[in-house]
Amino acid sequence: MIAISAARIAEAVNGRLAGVPDPDSVTVTSVTADSREVAPGTLFVAKPGETTDGHRFVPQAAAAGAVLHLTEREVLDESGSPYPCVVVEDVVLAMGALASRVVQLLRAEHPVTVVAVTGSVGKTTTKDLLHGIFGAEGPTVAPRNSYNGEVGVPLTVFTATEDTEYLVIEMGATHIGNIRYLCDMVRPDVGAVLCVGSAHAGEFGGVENIARAKGEMVEALTPEGTAVLNDDDARVRAMRERTAARVLSFGEGPEPRDP
């Protein structure tokens, strides 16, 4: 991760600092939402979960070397003083805001190509292939495991460093608007849509709504960007009408095929 001060983090997420007397002197060099991964210099994200609350692990994170905590409330130590923290209304949204700022800082240093991938199937395999391809050209960051949502995408961004040239982002969605949110976060230069299938069709209200959601990626691209579309999938092929970007296509045959 690029080093960033507590003061700049608080500004990026519109948060309130507590327990940090000199925020300009506190430097964060990594971010995690897993207290077991904390190392000296870490920002620990106290994310509330379905079965446990990350705020419970703030003392453990601090003991392991966390220099700052992203929280939704102050957590007090044994003396009654707050652990160093940035307090926000929603830590997940704050992660997204911080990731957006990190991408801006990376691009201010040198050209960084952000490549985003979505599709009902094949995302993880494709991002692994892209990691290998781009990695042969220059320093490349890609998601760990299937980090593709509102938590996983920021965590991927946070692993980028000053020398990163390619940032590969996997994007998943369970609702319309999810991919638009992620694209607003990282501003991809290249967006690849692999296919539109029936996974999560019930949550979306039908396959056509899945196509609408996946197409948010190409809608987010600028005229200077590139959309990469599966020409064998009729719903993906139709997305060329939804983007201002240059369109490249791939496929196995001359005729589009319904999924």
Regions found by a protein language model. Name each.
Residues 1-118, 125-136, 158:
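Short, basic phosphate-binding NTP loop
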Residues 19-20, 70-71, 87-88, 141-144, ...:
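General beta-strand structural signal in soluble alpha/beta enzymes
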Residues 48, 85, 207-211, 241, ...:
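Adenine nucleotide phosphate-binding catalytic loops in nucleotide-utilizing enzymes
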Residues 70-77, 231-234, 252-254:
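Short, polar loop motifs at secondary-structure junctions
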Residues 76-77, 148, 198, 255:
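Positions that flank functional sites
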Residues 94-231, 235-243:
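Phosphate-binding loop of NTP-binding sites
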